[in-house]
Amino acid sequence: MIRTVDIYDTSIIGVFATCTEDLALVPPLTKPEVCTILEEALDVRVVETLINGSTVVGALSRGNSNGFLLPYGSSVEEMQKRTGVPAGILPDRLNAVGNIVLANDSAALVHPELSDRALEIIARTLKVEVYRGTIAGIKNVGMAGVVTNKGLLVHPKVTVSEREALEEIFGLPVNIGTTNFGTQMLGSGLLANSKNFVAGSETTGPELGRIEEALGFLE
């Protein structure tokens, strides 16, 4: 099975796409063969879309099985029509949603400066408990880690206290890793759900092995 791809001829696939248990959002004109790989590997339906007119779909949106979060100015109706799940809009100036929200179907870790109102919208849309925090001191937690319902992989410089908080929030063991030949902001190069994962094309064999282990795909 193919485990690495490019989107728009770049390996930072997590910037341009995002996925849940059932859906993958990709920008228009993503190569058909890439869409097929995502569909087959992740067992999802691929939806081509722009977010606020932008192709950086992964940086600007975050979802789980219950809904999708979008930045201010996005069309909730259009997203709900395309995906078939509810959508919510973050009102804050911090609205590169994929960069600042790390979520699975049970919990979400978010940028520590998000407002109480934003946390309420996240909780209501994704139907999860929401917590503020950092990973390796980084506030853009959505790109500093990847979480599924089976596993959690984060930036190699995560602190002991952050690791303990993450384990408590998500109820999963915390593993460290990289993508794309040493990229520590590993969310930029990885799409994953509880069924499988796809990484950026520059991700090495050892990195793939680490991802596979961390996200629970080794028997």
From Swiss-Prot:
UniProt cross-references to InterPro entries, sorted A to Z: eIF6
CDD domains with a match to the protein in the record: IF6 (cd00527)
Disulfide bonds: none
Keywords of the record: Initiation factor, Protein biosynthesis
GO molecular function, one term: ribosome binding
Domain of life: Archaea
Protein's GO biological process: cytosolic ribosome assembly
Gene3D superfamilies given in the database record: L-arginine/glycine Amidinotransferase, Chain A
Pfam families given in the database record: eIF-6 (PF01912)
Free-text function comment from the UniProt entry: Binds to the 50S ribosomal subunit and prevents its association with the 30S ribosomal subunit to form the 70S initiation complex.
Family listed: Belongs to the eIF-6 family.
Name the UniProt record assigns to this protein: Translation initiation factor 6
Organism: Methanosarcina mazei (strain ATCC BAA-159 / DSM 3647 / Goe1 / Go1 / JCM 11833 / OCM 88) (Methanosarcina frisia)
